[in-house]
From Swiss-Prot:
It comes from the Eukaryota. One of its GO terms (cellular component) is cytosolic ribosome. Transmembrane segments: none annotated. PROSITE patterns: RIBOSOMAL_S28E. This is Small ribosomal subunit protein eS28. Belongs to the eukaryotic ribosomal protein eS28 family. The gene is RpS28b.
Amino acid sequence: MDKPVVWARVMKVLGRTGSQGQCTQVKVEFLGEQNRQIIRNVKGPVREGDILTLLESEREARRLR
């Protein structure tokens, strides 16, 4: 359970998701030595340039239709 937390920068806000639009789907880029981008669902206010703390860095969200 002692996985290190990973920081990621929001590169682009893709849209709202969830049954009532309560989540925002964003594309994030990992900070540090990893040069990867994934799509995540974020709850709460978020905009481009924000830094997120990801407790789980392997899980990727499904794309919006």
